[in-house]
From Swiss-Prot:
The gene is Usp3. This is Ubiquitin carboxyl-terminal hydrolase 3. The modification N-acetylmethionine is found at residue 1. Zn(2+) 2 binds at residues 29, 32, 49, 56. It comes from Mus musculus. Residues 159-511 form the USP domain. SUPFAM superfamilies: Cysteine proteinases (SSF54001), RING/U-box (SSF57850). Interacts (via UBP-type domain) with H2A; the interaction is less efficient than with monoubiquitinated H2A. Signal peptide: none annotated. Belongs to the peptidase C19 family. USP3 subfamily. The active site is at residues 168, 471. Deubiquitinase that plays a role in several cellular processes including transcriptional regulation, cell cycle progression or innate immunity. In response to DNA damage, deubiquitinates monoubiquitinated target proteins such as histone H2A and H2AX and thereby counteracts RNF168- and RNF8-mediated ubiquitination. In turn, participates in the recruitment of DNA damage repair factors to DNA break sites. Required for proper progression through S phase and subsequent mitotic entry. The lineage of its organism: Eukaryota, Metazoa, Chordata, Craniata, Vertebrata.
């Protein structure tokens, strides 16, 4: 929106010496010292955290209004309202009086000058950091891809994703998907599409969460992000262009609230699928179909029309079998799926006392068994029997008719109890390799020896107590090495650490598919 408060609030010099040292994206809040979601005041250059960290940037604005309310405003006070601030990671500008993002500038273009100065500071800090690391590596006998920093192993080749304000749920999913090899390779090999018009060509576009633009492509921005994550040219990538498109086409995820990573993943895959079906990213429908032809036709699972890489990789088919307990009539229904949501069995959900610590541990097999076991539907789910002509008691059982190349398993850790959505914090043991899905197949005799074996590719973990709070990180394996992705920080880790994680979403890749990808 056009903000009328810029002239009275943007008072700092673009190259102000008052700015802190170091890269702007890692600046700390002057109150709580948090480096998450830093915002710089464009009146006094002080740095505070965003409203969904500890809210000190907003409090800074509110505190500045008290003298103006208690005293007659002087000309000097009119100019010092501390109303406008800038995100130190995405460089978007926000006005607290308008309570919205700002798209205009002052007559002298001060906002853009501050933005460019912050970008230069970020680039300088990054260049200095790379030079320092390169020098250390030259003098080190360690692996050329690794560098020991403060006792942890930092990955040089992997790229983190900057947190743009409680966007860790998006970052964890993006990092996980970038390590599903066949899926990632497909997007990286798509031709690039330039969406900017002549007025903005050659200039970086700074999107805000309230801007409107009909000419956007989720596929194109997703492709750019995947290309940036493993090119090794930077330690952290700022995905504001992708997030702008996400915020535009998926309004549920606008703002700075913490969101559910699984819900975001489903929305993302669904919208990628729909856009690829229509060829909206500038690639013709025939070109997309030609790309898809490289994937085995027998492994495609259509959801809402023609198959795409989304359904070819993640698509499976469930058989839902319902039996009437009165007349014995059997009803079968086939449902396509992109992921399976598994309950954690109730016997494992209660908190254990110290003397119960050595009791049985919940395993992924327990969750899969609970999902596929025969169950009697309760009174609220009576089945409409076409033979009996009325709702009857019945049993239900799921079979997997077709397994996907990438099996996504979502553990249902959040449950509604009364008016609260509580988290099930139970540890679930899961295999890092050799997950055998054969016993859950409808026709296991028709499957090949390795077609039912899956190896773990990525894990999304939720840290905290509630879906609307906490923090998301991801573990993923790349070229045989496990990495931990915590927003902009990427560290090398080991299998033991991964195995101890309290998984929320597990991504498994078919062993046959992985072997095929390695041959390409």
């Amino acid at each position: 929106m056009e903000c009328p408060h810029l002239s009275s609030s943007v008072c700092i010099a673009p190259d102000s010496a008052k700015f802190p040292n170091g890269s702007p994206s890692s600046w700390c809040c002057s109150v709580c010292r948090s480096n998450k979601s830093p915002w710089v005041c464009l009146t006094c250059s002080s740095v505070h955290c965003g409203r969904y960290v500890n809210g000190h940037a907003k409090k800074h604005y509110e505190d500045a209004q008290i003298p103006l309310l208690n005293h007659k405003r002087s000309e000097k006070q009119e100019k010092a309202q501390h109303t406008v601030c800038m995100d130190c990671s995405s460089y978007s500008t926000y006005c607290y009086r308008c309570d919205d993002f700002v798209v205009n500038d002052t007559k002298l273009g001060l906002v853009q000058k501050v933005r460019e100065h912050l970008q230069n500071l970020e680039n300088s800090a990054f260049t200095a950091d790379r030079h320092r690391k390169r020098k250390l590596l030259e003098n080190s006998s360690l692996n050329s891809k690794l560098l020991k920093v403060n006792g942890s192993t930092t990955a040089i080749c992997a790229t983190g994703l900057r947190n743009l304000g409680n966007t860790c749920f998006m970052n964890a999913i993006l990092q996980s998907l970038s390590n599903i090899e066949q899926f990632c390779c497909y997007f990286k090999e798509l031709p690039a599409v330039e969406l900017r018009n002549g007025k903005t060509a050659g200039r970086r576009t700074y999107h805000t969460r309230s801007q409107g633009d009909s000419n956007v492509s989720l596929v194109e921005e997703f492709r750019k992000t995947l290309c940036a994550l493993w090119q090794g040219s930077q330690t952290a990538f700022s995905p504001e262009s992708l997030f702008y498109v996400v915020w535009k086409i998926m309004p549920n995820f606008r703002g700075y609230q913490q969101q559910d990573a699984h819900e975001f993943m489903r929305y993302l895959l669904d919208h990628l699928h729909l856009e690829l079906q229509g060829g909206f990213n500038g690639v013709s429908r025939s070109a997309i179909l030609q790309e898809n032809s490289t994937l085995s036709a027998s492994n495609k699972c259509c959801i809402n029309g023609a198959s795409t890489v989304v359904t070819a990789i993640f698509g499976g088919i469930l058989q839902n079998e319902v039996n009437c307990l009165i007349c014995g009539t059997e009803s079968r229904k086939f449902d396509p799926f992109l992921d399976l949501s598994l309950d954690i069995p109730s016997q494992f959900r209660s908190k254990r006392s110290k003397n119960q610590e050595n009791g049985p541990v919940c395993s992924l097999r327990d969750c899969l068994r609970s999902f596929t076991d025969l169950e009697e539907l309760d009174e609220t789910e009576l089945y409409m029997c076409h033979k009996c002509k009325k709702k009857q008691k019945s049993t239900k059982k799921f079979w997997i008719q077709k397994l996907p190349k990438a099996l996504c398993l979502h553990l249902k850790r959040f449950h509604w109890t009364a008016y609260l959505r509580n988290k099930v914090d139970t540890y679930v043991q899961f295999p890092l390799r050799g997950l055998d899905m054969k016993c859950y197949l409808l026709e296991p005799e028709n499957s090949g020896p390795d077609s039912c074996l899956y190896d773990l590719a990525a894990v999304v973990v939720h840290h905290g107590s509630g879906v609307g709070s906490g923090h998301y990180t991801a573990y993923a394996v790349h070229e045989g090495r496990w990495f931990h992705f915590n927003d902009s920080t990427v560290t090398v880790t080991d299998e033991e650490t991964v195995g101890k994680a309290k998984a929320y979403i597990l991504f498994y890749v078919e062993r046959q598919a992985r072997a095929g990808a390695e041959k390409l």
